């Protein structure tokens, strides 16, 4: 029972962190829904105000029609401009899942085209056309520093309490198991498995 409680508490922490970042993404989403466009200056200023003090979010991106059109900070991430998330081989499965489901998805971590490694939180944006029908506008995307994100969830406390842990996912296209984070010596027996929700590729603790 103690192990189950520890695992469930950890899952709750991970989901709470994701919801915190999603709230920031939703601010951008609401602005697009109201105005359909946002200037580079407005985007940069809003993104700057939303930067978290721990810098877990390393970049904010807007992807109109699925293609990265605006990034913040610009200089560090300008190489990502023009990347089509709906067609990129590594990102298209998660991006299309978010688009089709209308729900956010977390994917990665990936080697980023602008350098470094990060997970991507895709938040799909829909706007009403002149007939009142919803049309896909694109994505608000948060680039998450994976190592800092894991540190924020305090997974190391599980090991300090005598538990071993491993977070892994199955890649959508290949069903291959990929380990995202683990303790120094994860156990393979007497394990408890829990799922995280709203993850584009099934992720387990």
What are the roles of these predicted feature ranges?
Residues 1-38:
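Juxtamembrane extracytoplasmic/periplasmic/luminal helical "stalk" adjacent to the first N-terminal
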């Amino acid at each position: 029972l103690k192990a189950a409680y520890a695992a469930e508490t950890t899952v709750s922490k991970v989901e709470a962190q994701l919801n915190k970042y999603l709230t920031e993404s939703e601010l951008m989403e609401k602005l697009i829904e109201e105005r359909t466009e946002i200037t580079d200056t407005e985007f940069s200023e809003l993104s700057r105000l939303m930067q978290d003090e721990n810098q877990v979010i390393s970049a904010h991106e807007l992807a109109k029609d699925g293609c990265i059109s605006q990034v913040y900070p610009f200089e560090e991430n300008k190489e990502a401009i023009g990347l089509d998330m709906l067609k990129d081989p590594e990102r298209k499965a998660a991006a299309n899942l978010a688009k089709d489901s209308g729900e956010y998805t977390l994917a990665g971590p990936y080697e980023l085209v602008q350098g470094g490694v990060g997970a991507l939180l895709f938040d799909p944006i829909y706007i009403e056309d002149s007939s009142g029908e919803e049309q896909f506008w694109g994505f608000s995307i948060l680039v998450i520093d994976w190592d800092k994100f894991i540190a924020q969830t305090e997974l190391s406390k599980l090991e300090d309490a005598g538990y071993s842990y491993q977070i892994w996912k199955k890649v959508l296209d290949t069903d291959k198991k990929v380990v995202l984070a683990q303790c120094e010596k994860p156990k393979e027996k007497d394990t408890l498995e829990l799922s995280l929700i709203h993850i584009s590729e099934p992720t387990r603790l």
